[in-house]
C-alpha cells in the first residue's frame, strides 16, 4: 500500500498553481496524495487578489483557521509537503497534535518565528535570495535539516530543477530500506 502524502499549497492555492501538476506527475505513482489549497483551508475571502492582501489575510487569522481545518480533515499519520504558507500551516498543525510521519517544507519563511519543532523528521529548503528565510542559527537551535539553493528566491518551488530535487528526496525517504545492523560476536 502506498504511503500517504499530504500537500499543502502556497498562499496562492490553485489560482496560480499550475506548477503543482509537475509535483503530482512525479509523485502520484508512488504516493496516495491529498492536495489542500491553503486559501480554501483558511476560508479566505479577499476582494482584491494581490500578494499583499492575501498575505495579510493569512497573518491576520487565516493561518490559524487553516490549521484548524487541516486538523479536522487529516487525522491519520502521513508525510507532509508544504510550500511557503502551506509549510507553516502543516508545522503549526503538527505542534497541535496532527499525526505527521515527516515534514518537507519549501520556502516556508514564516517558520523563522517558530520556537518549537514538530516531533518528526523535517527538511526545509530555501533560496539564498529569499530575504525572509530563517537565519542559520535557527536551523541549528531546532535541529532541522536544511538546504540553501544559490540563485533562487522565494518562488523556487515552481522551478523544474527544484521540483525534481524535492520529488527525488521524497521518493528516497519512503523507498530506502533501513540499513541492517551487523552483529559482531565478542569472545
Give short role names for the model-derived ranges:
Residues 2-73:
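Serine-hydrolase catalytic machinery in alpha/beta-hydrolase-like enzymes
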Residues 81-90:
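Gly/Ala-rich beta-loop-alpha elbow adjacent to hydrolase catalytic centers
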Residues 89-93, 114:
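Hydrolases whose catalytic domains are alpha/beta-hydrolase-1, hotdog thioesterase
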Residues 97-98, 112-120, 139-142:
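Short, conserved loop/helix-junction motifs that constitute active-site signature segments
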Residues 98-110:
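A conserved short beta-strand
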Residues 124-126:
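Short beta-strand/loop motif that positions the catalytic acidic residue
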Residues 133-145:
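Conserved loop-alpha-helix segment in the C-terminal half of the alpha/beta-hydrolase fold
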Residues 151-161:
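Catalytic histidine-centered segment of alpha/beta-hydrolase-like enzymes
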